[in-house]
């Protein structure tokens, strides 16, 4: 049979990620769950080259539905897999196996998922509940998760390192753990990760309104969980937001020794109402930050009815990082008064 794809492409507003409930993002029962697989471009290509009958066999002849976001990102893709827990537990390892070239002696699988930090739970909860549960079904399985949030989202990258034999029961254990968490917090807000090529945008109104300024994950020094390397590589990398300990930094980027003096552009996306509050409370704040950091700061013209504005910051990577830190601190401080 000819090669093809059983994946349905869906549209998404990449600059304004939706805010969903935990139940909307993942599901709330074992009969229908949504798992968000994070795949590399090579893995997607391998999937698309598979004959249609093999794809259908892996997806249990339509019992497992797969959707992906339409985007120009060439580095990462999200496969949203929807089915029962039992179907997903067998289909996901099979899918990862066929799209990941491995040596014969290497029977391990790395399964990458995007999962909300709040659904996943605290480090204490993970170590007291999830990891012992995984270890009880497979003592060779490792659970890794990204130190910071995926770009413009409230999700982390979660990686399961397991062997082919145990992969299905490991996935089933993880999915049941997530369902048990959602039963307690079904309406908690989630900003899902949508891979895109709009890498110059720093944050979004969705994340701005969802992240509490007291959260240890998001601070003025690291707004939205994006590390400073995002600025130094903002010139040519299609996916420069190096927010994970698992994925390697791929694609061209500005060498750090050049980035120190090279001028780069960044945009900070903020709610219009919040920027209006800043103008009212501190009318000269943007000029003050610009002078303090030696970065050029302007507010782009936008539709008067838009609920979003873009603050453009132009300067060296160091100047931009300092300016964005101060902008974030000024904006978030308005919510404390």
Swiss-Prot record:
Residues 263-327 form the KH domain. GO terms for biological process: mRNA 5'-splice site recognition; regulation of gene expression; regulation of RNA metabolic process. It is found in: Cytoplasm; Nucleus. Keywords: Cytoplasm, mRNA processing, mRNA splicing, Nucleus, Ribonucleoprotein, RNA-binding, Spliceosome. One of its GO terms (cellular component) is nucleus. It comes from the Eukaryota. PROSITE patterns: KH_TYPE_1. GO terms for molecular function: mRNA binding. Coiled coil: none annotated. Component of the U1 snRNP particle, which recognizes and binds the 5'-splice site of pre-mRNA. Together with other non-snRNP factors, U1 snRNP forms the spliceosomal commitment complex, that targets pre-mRNA to the splicing pathway. Component of the U1 snRNP particle, a subcomplex of the spliceosome. This is U1 snRNP-associated protein usp108. The gene is usp108.
């Amino acid at each position: 049979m000819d090669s093809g794809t059983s994946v349905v492409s869906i549209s998404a507003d990449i600059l304004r990620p939706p805010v969903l409930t935990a139940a909307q993002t993942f599901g709330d029962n074992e009969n229908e769950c949504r798992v968000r697989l994070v795949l590399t471009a090579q893995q997607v290509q391998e999937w698309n080259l598979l004959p249609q009958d093999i794809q259908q066999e892996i997806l249990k002849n339509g019992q497992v539905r797969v959707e992906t976001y339409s985007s120009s990102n060439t580095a990462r893709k999200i496969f949203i897999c929807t089915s029962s827990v039992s179907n997903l537990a067998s289909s996901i390892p099979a899918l990862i196996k066929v799209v990941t070239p491995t040596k014969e002696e290497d029977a391990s699988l790395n399964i990458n998922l995007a999962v909300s930090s709040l659904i996943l739970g605290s480090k204490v909860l993970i170590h007291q509940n999830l990891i012992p549960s995984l270890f009880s079904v497979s003592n060779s399985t490792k659970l890794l998760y990204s130190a910071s949030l995926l770009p413009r989202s409230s999700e982390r990258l979660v990686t399961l390192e397991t062997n082919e034999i145990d992969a299905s029961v490991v996935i089933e254990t993880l999915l049941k753990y997530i369902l048990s968490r959602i039963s307690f917090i079904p309406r908690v807000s989630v900003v899902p990760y949508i891979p895109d090529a709009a890498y110059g945008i720093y944050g979004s109104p969705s994340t701005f309104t969802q992240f509490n300024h007291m959260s240890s994950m998001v601070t003025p020094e690291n707004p939205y969980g994006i590390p400073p390397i995002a600025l130094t590589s903002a010139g040519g990398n299609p996916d420069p937001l190096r927010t994970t300990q698992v994925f390697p930094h791929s694609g061209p980027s500005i060498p750090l020794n050049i980035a120190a003096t090279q001028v780069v552009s960044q945009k900070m996306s903020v709610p219009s109402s919040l920027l209006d509050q800043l103008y009212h409370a501190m009318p000269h704040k943007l000029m003050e930050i610009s002078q303090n950091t030696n970065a050029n700061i302007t507010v782009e013209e936008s539709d008067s009815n838009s609920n979003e504005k873009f603050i453009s910051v132009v300067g060296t990577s160091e100047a931009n990082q300092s300016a964005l830190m101060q902008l974030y601190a000024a904006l978030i401080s308005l919510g404390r008064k």
